[in-house]
């Protein structure tokens, strides 16, 4: 009998979203006629835009010809997509990113979870609290976190509380962190950061030889001027930061699977002996060993997102979701809730009513309003007493959900 990786036994009892699904299923079985409105997990509801559909149809037909068939593609991504990403997502910001610094993948969740594999198992990890669970759980699996305490925190993790009192801006740790996870626009709080704050993080990383893992999956939802769209807007960030982007929420690719990670050539790590090593080269070795690449058809669809018509159609979808966010935000405010986010992100973070715990509030919404959201405590101890709602639902469902909640 083979021994197991016992670090998996240190994981919390259940991943957040399966637990939500379990509770909803139990309620549905007992109340089969109930119309449940789901504003929990951040899955999109609008269809893929026409420009992307047309591009994928054309690519599929191309694959059906002798001259246009594509088998295994380049693991890092086809040049046509790499070039579009570099020119549109970074060139438009005045940031120069080379094609060789971009790696196309099947999702930011995978990238955020897999990137830790190239770092030492004794690397000190810092995460905000609340936090996207994948950042923590993958490091638990790798054995970096130690044991979980009664307060829900792992003994070897550095937790950086993001609270109402500090404007949901995690404070730079006083101790040295090797790897720092940052997410802006933030999941779950829906808040954003400033260039000044990012500059301070870059300075900290340089001083401590740290690497920042910057999750920017919701960048396309930024609406206010002056809000940074990339950490590379800060001078020197290429020397200390990796950035994650995704087509999932931006272009509705949750069912198609396409994202990318940017690892600048300037970024270095160290061996135990002090030798500098290219992080780009390390990730390239890992990526090409474990991943065969995103399909040609999907990458042609992703490329179409950058066409003039594709951009127009995608912006319309984003506007639809952000209109939902405004409805949720304003509706909850009128109902007396304290709310955050929902301006530059598709998530609304609210304080639970009557000092209920996050899960008790979940049960109340499900039982009394048949509305499903996400308990804040599922994102970390500092999320206790808070709740996340997603703007990715259908307009009519969002309006009905807010009406139901308002009558509680």
Swiss-Prot record:
GO terms for biological process: lysine biosynthetic process via diaminopimelate, diaminopimelate-aminotransferase pathway. One of its GO terms (molecular function) is pyridoxal phosphate binding. Pathway: Amino-acid biosynthesis; L-lysine biosynthesis via DAP pathway; LL-2,6-diaminopimelate from (S)-tetrahydrodipicolinate (aminotransferase route): step 1/1. CDD domains: AAT_like (cd00609). NCBIfam families: DAPAT_plant (TIGR03542). Belongs to the class-I pyridoxal-phosphate-dependent aminotransferase family. LL-diaminopimelate aminotransferase subfamily. This is LL-diaminopimelate aminotransferase. It comes from Leptospira borgpetersenii serovar Hardjo-bovis (strain JB197).
């Amino acid at each position: 009998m083979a021994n197991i990786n016992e670090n998996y036994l240190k994981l919390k009892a259940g991943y957040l979203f399966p637990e939500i699904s379990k509770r909803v299923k139990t309620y549905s079985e007992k109340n089969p006629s109930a119309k449940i409105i789901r504003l929990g997990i951040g899955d999109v509801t609008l269809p893929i835009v026409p420009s992307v559909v047309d591009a994928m149809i054309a690519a599929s037909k191309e694959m059906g010809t002798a001259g246009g068939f594509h088998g295994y593609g380049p693991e890092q991504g086809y040049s046509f997509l790499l070039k579009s990403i570099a020119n549109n997502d970074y060139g438009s910001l005045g940031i120069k990113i080379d094609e060789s610094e971009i790696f196309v993948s099947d999702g930011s969740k995978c990238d955020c979870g897999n990137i830790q594999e190239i770092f030492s198992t004794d690397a000190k990890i810092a995460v905000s609290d609340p936090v996207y669970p994948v950042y923590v759980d993958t490091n638990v699996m790798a054995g970096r976190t130690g044991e979980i305490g009664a307060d829900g925190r792992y003994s070897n993790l550095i937790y950086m509380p993001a609270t109402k009192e500090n404007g949901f801006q995690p404070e730079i740790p006083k101790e040295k962190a090797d790897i720092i996870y940052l997410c802006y626009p933030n999941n779950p709080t829906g808040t954003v950061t400033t260039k000044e704050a990012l500059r301070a993080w870059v300075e900290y990383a340089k001083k401590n030889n740290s690497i920042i893992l910057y999750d920017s999956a919701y960048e396309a939802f930024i609406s206010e001027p002056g809000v940074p769209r990339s950490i590379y807007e800060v001078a020197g960030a290429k020397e200390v930061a990796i950035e994650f982007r995704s087509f999932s929420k931006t272009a509705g690719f949750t069912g198609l699977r396409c994202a990318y990670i940017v690892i600048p050539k300037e970024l270095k790590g160290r061996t135990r002996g002090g030798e500098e090593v290219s992080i780009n080269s390390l990730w390239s070795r890992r990526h090409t060993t474990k991943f065969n690449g995103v399909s040609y058809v999907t990458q042609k669809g992703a490329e179409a997102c950058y066409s003039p018509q594709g951009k127009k159609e995608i912006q319309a979808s984003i506007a639809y979701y952000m209109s939902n966010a405004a409805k949720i935000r304003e509706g909850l405010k009128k109902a007396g809730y304290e709310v955050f986010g929902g301006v530059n992100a598709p998530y609304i973070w609210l304080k639970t009513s009557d000092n209920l715990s996050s899960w008790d509030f979940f049960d109340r919404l499900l039982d009394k309003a048949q509305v499903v959201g996400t308990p804040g405590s599922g994102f970390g101890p500092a999320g206790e007493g808070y709740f996340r709602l997603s703007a990715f639902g259908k307009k009519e469902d969002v309006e009905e959900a807010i009406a139901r909640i308002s009558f509680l």
